Regions:
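Acidic/histidine-rich catalytic cores of soluble enzymes
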Residues: 151, 157-277
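Hydrophobic faces of well-ordered beta-strands that scaffold small-molecule active sites
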Residues: 5-12, 49-53, 83-88, 132-136, ...
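Aromatic-rich peripheral "rim/lid" segments of glycoside hydrolase catalytic domains that contact
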Residues: 274-276, 280-291, 315-350
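A short, acidic, amphipathic alpha-helical segment used as a generic capping/interface helix at domain edges
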Residues: 36, 241-247, 285-308
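Short, flexible/disordered intra-domain loops and linkers
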Residues: 15-29, 59-64, 145-151, 219-236, ...
Length: 350
């Protein structure tokens, strides 16, 4: 029997940047170090196939030149890694703007999307990026969004529709990562509503992160949309199955990019990053997710269905871990082992 070799297994480079580098936070971990950790991880002869990337300093500038991108491509190639999905820095502190702001915010948001799509296209043309999307969100918080939820959702949808036009010009696709900290995306209901309003399923999809979507079940920033009751008993597997199936059946048709992750049912913020679903280590005993089982709800056509094979790669996401954890080789071997288990259970062979 052939061993599954798809989806390809990627690590994320941005945990070296997210929640780090600001006053009171730990220092950044440079890109070379993150790529070395990724390339050196190995479990029974299996290694990571590639990495996903945040298009922002200190890893790679959103204003990178072609020579900068050639150097990036060389960094990947010499480690036998491909590049997959990339994150456009659409937020105000990184040169972007709020998608609900019809003025400068929208202009800056779209400018960063354009730069991100151009980089993604260039890396694709260089032959180091065979698949992947450009990751975005709404770059505004729930509190601002809730000042006028109906009007703001309309404005956000208009901004994202324009972003789709830009992406198509570069032959790229966008995916919005559902997190409780983004206005218009703070619950599974608002997320689907936004995707339906934009109505560009060939260009704008959903990026499902297992840690962040778990918080959708709990309704952390939208109690009216919670799928698990307050004080939920995590030992009640049947109730969790029912809620998780409802969530994934709703969002899976829109999902074009997938993050394997663990969460302990709490939120966490670090440095400049707002509170969002807490990423936990792959083998954290407090993790609420049976990662392999729950990944199947995203990677198959419903519970027990056939693998749908729509994601050419899947990526581990574990942000805001202490640097001591990040620089421990066992961390990455544990992560890779979990990713292999997911692929063996729900992948395919080509």
């Amino acid at each position: 029997m052939k061993v599954n070799n798809y989806p390809k297994l990627h690590n994320a480079a941005w945990p070296g940047v997210v929640g780090k580098g600001s006053p009171g936070a730990e220092p950044f971990i440079d890109l070379d170090t993150m790529l070395d950790h990724t390339a050196k991880a190995e479990v029974n002869g299996v290694k990571f196939d590639g990495f996903d990337l945040f298009l922002y300093d200190p890893h790679i500038s959103i204003d990178a030149t072609e020579d900068d991108l050639k150097r990036l491509a060389d960094k990947a190639s010499k480690r036998n890694l491909t590049i997959g999905s990339v994150v456009a820095p659409v937020w105000p502190p990184t040169g972007g703007g709020a998608a609900l702001d019809e003025g400068e915010g929208r202009k800056n948001f779209l400018a960063q999307v354009e730069k991100g799509c151009e980089i993604a296209m260039t890396l694709r043309e260089m032959g180091v990026r065979p698949y992947g999307i450009v990751r975005i969100d709404t770059a505004c918080g729930p509190s601002d969004f809730l000042k006028d939820p109906i009007g703001n959702q309309r404005k956000i949808a208009e901004t994202l529709w324009m972003a789709c036009e830009i992406a198509e010009d570069f032959g790229e696709k966008l995916a919005a990562e559902g997190e409780i900290c983004w206005g218009g995306m703070q619950s599974w209901i608002t997320m689907v509503d936004l995707l339906e309003r934009v109505d560009r399923p060939e260009t704008l999809g959903f990026q499902a992160d297992m840690a962040h979507t778990l918080l959708y079940l709990l309704g952390y920033n939208a109690p009216e949309h919670r799928l698990l009751p307050e004080g939920f008993d995590w030992k009640d597997e049947a109730a969790f199955d029912e809620a998780y199936m409802k969530l994934t059946d709703t969002l899976r048709p829109w999902t074009t990019d997938f993050h394997v992750a663990q969460n302990d049912g709490t939120v966490h913020g670090s440095g400049s990053h707002d509170k969002t679903g807490r990423h936990c280590q792959a083998k954290d005993p407090n993790g609420k997710l049976d990662i392999v089982k729950r990944a199947g709800y995203w990677l198959r056509e419903g519970e027990g269905g056939m693998p749908h094979m729509r994601y050419r790669h899947i990526c581990w996401d574990g942000c805001m871990f202490p640097n001591s954890v990040m620089n421990n080789p066992q961390t990455w071997n544990d992560i890779l082992s979990t990713m292999i288990d997911v692929r063996n259970a729900h992948g395919w062979h080509e």
